[in-house]
From Swiss-Prot:
<feature type="binding site">
    <location>
        <position position="98"/>
    </location>
    <ligand>
        <name>substrate</name>
    </ligand>
</feature>
<feature type="binding site">
    <location>
        <begin position="45"/>
        <end position="48"/>
    </location>
    <ligand>
        <name>substrate</name>
    </ligand>
</feature>
<dbReference type="GO" id="GO:0005829">
    <property type="term" value="C:cytosol"/>
</dbReference>
<feature type="binding site">
    <location>
        <position position="23"/>
    </location>
    <ligand>
        <name>substrate</name>
    </ligand>
</feature>
<feature type="domain" description="MGS-like">
    <location>
        <begin position="6"/>
        <end position="152"/>
    </location>
</feature>
<feature type="binding site">
    <location>
        <position position="19"/>
    </location>
    <ligand>
        <name>substrate</name>
    </ligand>
</feature>
<protein>
    <recommendedName>
        <fullName>Methylglyoxal synthase</fullName>
        <ecNumber>4.2.3.3</ecNumber>
    </recommendedName>
</protein>
<comment type="similarity">
    <text>Belongs to the methylglyoxal synthase family.</text>
</comment>
<dbReference type="InterPro" id="IPR004363">
    <property type="entry name" value="Methylgl_synth"/>
</dbReference>
<comment type="function">
    <text>Catalyzes the formation of methylglyoxal from dihydroxyacetone phosphate.</text>
</comment>
<feature type="active site" description="Proton donor/acceptor">
    <location>
        <position position="71"/>
    </location>
</feature>
<keyword id="KW-0456">Lyase</keyword>
<dbReference type="GO" id="GO:0008929">
    <property type="term" value="F:methylglyoxal synthase activity"/>
</dbReference>
<dbReference type="InterPro" id="IPR036914">
    <property type="entry name" value="MGS-like_dom_sf"/>
</dbReference>
<dbReference type="InterPro" id="IPR018148">
    <property type="entry name" value="Methylglyoxal_synth_AS"/>
</dbReference>
<dbReference type="GO" id="GO:0019242">
    <property type="term" value="P:methylglyoxal biosynthetic process"/>
</dbReference>
<feature type="binding site">
    <location>
        <begin position="65"/>
        <end position="66"/>
    </location>
    <ligand>
        <name>substrate</name>
    </ligand>
</feature>
Length: 152
């Protein structure tokens, strides 16, 4: 597939997601990094968003709970280029009923080339990168060219 670039502003749109067994880790991570996160627009799936907001007083745009469609909503925002970074603490040792949604979310994050961290170590590296507060260009699929070729 051909690619193009999209401009990402210095203020990022960051998605915060965590499975039940990982919510406490994400909340603690957010508390530790509140000084970084407060400079960005934050989104989260339902329960996670409310818990983070309560623990940190950060403003969170909460979507539906993951199993109720929040993962799908987040995937749609990624495909619409409305999410720039995703922090997703998931539990590789426990299957969840909405596992296909989780896999779809991870896939769409990879397709649209958004930086995403799936554990504390990678989240720390990502949030502490000098690029997190800078304008950047991301290489993404050129959907218009793809569509034009398919419609010929």
């Amino acid at each position: 597939m051909e690619t193009t670039f999209r401009h990402v502003a210095a203020q990022k749109h960051i998605a915060l997601v965590a499975h039940d067994h990982c919510k406490e880790d994400l909340i603690n991570w957010c508390q530790k990094n509140v000084h970084h996160l407060q400079n960005h627009q934050l989104y989260a799936t339902g329960t996670t968003g409310h818990l983070i907001e309560k623990a940190t007083e950060l403003k969170i745009n909460s979507l539906l709970s993951g199993p109720m469609g929040g993962d799908q909503q987040l995937g749609a925002l990624i495909a619409e280029n409305k999410i720039d970074v995703m922090i997703f603490f998931w539990d590789p040792m426990n299957a969840v009923p909405h596992d296909p949604d989780v896999k779809a979310l991870l896939r769409i994050a990879a397709v649209w080339n958004i930086p995403h961290a799936m554990n504390i170590a990678s989240a720390d590296l990502l949030i502490n990168s000098p690029l997190i507060n800078r304008e950047i260009e991301l290489r993404i699929p050129d959907y218009q060219t793809y569509l034009q070729k398919r419609l010929k």
